[in-house]
Regions:
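Conserved donor-binding/catalytic core segment of Leloir-type glycosyltransferases
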Residues: 198-215, 221-224, 237
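N-terminal subdomain of nucleotide-sugar transferases
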Residues: 1-57, 374, 380
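Conserved acidic donor-binding segment of nucleotide-sugar-dependent glycosyltransferases
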Residues: 319, 323-330, 339-344
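Carbohydrate-associated surface elements
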Residues: 168, 187
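Aromatic "clamp/platform" in nucleotide-sugar-dependent glycosyltransferases that forms part
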Residues: 287
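Short His-centered aromatic/hydrophobic patch
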Residues: 110-115
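Short hydrophobic beta-strand element within catalytic cores of glycosyltransferases
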Residues: 304-307
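Nucleotide-activated donor-binding/catalytic signature segment of Leloir-type glycosyltransferases, i.e.
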Residues: 249-267
Length: 386
C-alpha cells in the first residue's frame, strides 16, 4: 500500500534527532514492502539550514518531501487561528505535491497530536483514512494543559484508528479523552545491534537524550557522589545537547566529577551505536517518558539498563536486562549504580540484544502497523460498499 506519513521532518546532519522516530518507522514500513512518503513542513527558525520551497530526499526506499516558506513565529503574530490555518495550508500543499509525484495514498499516518490535528484537514478534504500515533510526553501526565485537552478532543475523534507507543500512554488517552487505542512500541533501529563488547580500561556508564529538566540528568552527579565508586575505575558519557548543558556541567564540576562525567554533545546514530557498544551500563534517569527509544537502542546493543519507573519502561525492562528505581530517587539510583557496577557479569549481553530484536525490531513493528492499516482500510471499504 501507499502510505503518506506526516512527520516533523527528516533527520539531517545538523539535527540528527529531528524526525528520527518517524524515519525509523518509515524505513521499517518500506522494508516491509510498502511505498512510504514522508510529508513535512518546517516552521522553525533555521534560515541557514533551509532552502525556500520544496526539499526532496530519497533514502532507504523512503521518499521525503519537506516544505519551508516562513518561520511560524512570524505567522503567530497574526493570532492562533491564522497560524493554524497557515499550517494546514502548508500540509495540504505538500500533500498535493506528493500526490502529483507518487499517486494517491491508501492511508494517512500522522505522528504526534499537533501534526494529527492538521492531518484531519487532509482526511476531511480528500476522503482518506487517517491513523494517528501518539508519543507526545505532554499527554502522559496526571493533568494536561487546557489547550492540549481541547486539541486532543478536537482531533482524536476523527481518527480511523489511534495508536500509542506504550500501555501507560494508552491508559492516559482513555483517561483524558475516552479514546481506545492500539499499542505498538517504538523501534530499535537497524543501526543498533549486538557486537562483542569492546571493553576499555574503565567501567563505562552511558546516557543519551536532550539536556532538559525532564530527562533528569541533574540526578547523575548527586547519585555518583553517593555511590562513591573508585574514581579511577569508572566514567560516564552523556550524549545530547540542550538548554541545561551549562547547569549540568556546573553540577558535575562542583561534585568533583569533572574527570569522570563527560558531556559529549550531539552524535548521529552510528556514533551513538559505537559508544553504546563500548559501554557497560546505560542509565535513563528521566522524570517523564512514554516509551524510551534510547533504552531500546541500548538493549539492541546488549547493554543492561538502569531506568526510572516512568511511562512504559516496565514494558521493556525486567530482571534479566536491567534495574529500575523510582523517579527522582537519588538514593535508589545510587544503589542501582553500585549494584550494577559490582554485578556486571550477571547480564548476558547477547541474550539482551536477542530479546530486544524479538520484540522491537523493525520487521516486528512494521508487521503490527500493517495489520492496523489493513483493518482500517477493510472496514472503510465494507462501509462504502454497504
Amino acid at each position: 500500500m501507499t502510505i503518506f506519513l506526516i512527520a516533523r521532518g527528516y533527520p539531517e546532519t545538523q539535527e540528527p534527532q529531528w524526525g528520527c522516530f518517524e524515519k525509523d518507522q518509515a524505513e521499517a514500513l518500506a522494508q516491509y514492502g510498502h511505498k512510504v512518503v514522508m510529508l513535512s513542513y518546517d516552521g522553525r527558525f533555521r534560515w541557514r539550514f533551509r532552502k525556500l520551497g520544496f526539499t526532496y530526499i530519497q533514502k532507504n526506499n523512503v521518499h521525503s518531501i519537506n516544505y519551508f516558506v516562513c518561520p511560524s513565529i512570524f505567522i503567530k503574530l497574526f493570532g492562533t487561528k491564522i497560524k493554524g490555518k497557515w499550517e494546514c495550508w502548508q500540509l495540504r500543499h505538500v500533500y498535493k505535491k506528493a500526490v502529483q509525484l507518487y499517486g494517491q495514498p491508501d492511508i494517512l499516518y500522522s505522528h504526534y497530536l499537533c501534526l494529527s490535528h492538521e492531518a484531519v484537514s487532509l482526511k476531511l478534504r480528500f476522503s482518506k483514512p487517517l491513523v494517528m500515533i501518539e508519543h507526545w510526553s505532554e499527554i502522559n501526565k496526571d493533568t494536561i494543559l487546557p489547550r492540549v485537552q481541547k486539541m486532543g478532543s478536537d482531533t482524536y475523534r476523527y481518527a480511523d484508528a489511534v495508536i500509542t507507543v506504550a500501555q501507560s500512554l494508552q491508559n492516559r488517552l482513555m483517561e483524558h479523552f475516552g479514546i481506545s487505542a492500539h499499542v505498538v512500541h517504538n523501534i530499535a533501529g537497524t543501526e543498533f545491534y549486538y557486537q562483542k563488547h569492546t571493553s576499555i580500561n574503565k567501567f563505562t556508564f552511558v546516557a543519551t537524550g536532550s539536556l532538559v529538566s525532564r530527562k533528569g540528568f541533574d540526578l547523575l552527579p548527586k547519585a555518583f557522589v553517593k555511590a562513591n565508586l573508585p574514581k579511577n575505575q569508572w566514567q560516564m558519557n552523556i550524549i545530547g545537547e540542550g538548554q541545561e548543558h551549562q547547569n549540568l556541567q556546573t553540577a558535575i564540576d562542583s561534585s568533583g566529577l569533572t574527570d569522570n562525567i563527560h558531556l559529549l554533545g550531539t552524535k548521529n546514530k552510528e556514533q551513538i551505536a559505537q559508544l553504546l557498544n563500548q559501554s557497560d551500563v546505560f542509565i535513563l534517569p528521566s522524570r517523564n517518558e512514554n516509551f524510551s527509544v534510547a533504552v531500546l537502542e541500548a538493549l539492541a546493543c546488549g547493554v543492561p539498563v538502569i531506568a526510572s519507573i516512568c511511562g512504559g519502561i516496565r514494558e521493556c525492562i525486567n530482571e534479566k536486562n536491567g534495574l529500575l528505581f523510582p523517579v527522582n530517587d537519588v538514593d535508589a539510583l545510587a544503589e542501582a549504580i553500585k549494584t550494577m557496577y559490582l554485578n556486571r557479569t550477571n547480564y548476558n549481553r547477547q541474550a539482551i540484544a536477542a530479546d530486544c530484536q524479538a520484540r522491537f525490531s523493525p520487521e516486528v513493528i512494521a508487521r503490527q502497523l500493517t495489520g492496523i492499516f489493513q483493518q482500517v482500510i477493510a472496514k472503510l471499504s465494507w462501509y462504502r460498499k454497504s
